[in-house]
Amino acid sequence: MRHRLSGRQLNRNASHRQAMFRNMASSLVRHEIIKTTLPKAKELRRVVEPLITLAKSDSVANRRLAFARTRDRDVVGKLFTELGPRFQGRPGGYTRILKCGFRAGDNAPMAYIELVGRPVDAEAVTEE
């Protein structure tokens, strides 16, 4: 029985899943928007949101915790210098998931996951 088992397996063993979400979380922090499958996006929220909450209070201990979870020095720097102050007044809900259809090869549901206060390039969104 699967009583009290949380999280999705995603057809991966534990170390593969941990490495995948560590890489995806680093990419999301670095680029502030990524495209992935819908189940991975929903599960990625559970990894990224606590990282941003951790970054709201800057301390050496919190930076070490964030580094232990991401293993990327640049990502830790961006978390504590940009994202922590940006989300200081927001009590959670730092990510948004937008569904974007189905993948051509295997019809998997795809989604964009982005950070909520993401600056949008005005010149990139032009109507023709």
UniProtKB/Swiss-Prot annotation:
Which is an annotated GO molecular function term of this record?
structural constituent of ribosome
Q: Which NCBIfam families match?
A: L17
Its recorded name reads Large ribosomal subunit protein bL17
Subunit structure, interactors included: Part of the 50S ribosomal subunit. Contacts protein L32.
Q: Which family does it belong to?
A: Belongs to the bacterial ribosomal protein bL17 family.
Task: Check the record and name the SUPFAM superfamilies matching this protein.
Answer: Prokaryotic ribosomal protein L17
**Which GO biological process annotations does it have?**
translation
Alphabetically list the UniProt keywords: Ribonucleoprotein, Ribosomal protein
The UniProt entry's GO CC annotations, sorted and at most eight, read:
cytosolic large ribosomal subunit
Q: Which gene name belongs to this protein?
A: rplQ
Q: Where are the transmembrane segments?
A: none
- The protein's organism comes out as Tolumonas auensis (strain DSM 9187 / NBRC 110442 / TA 4)
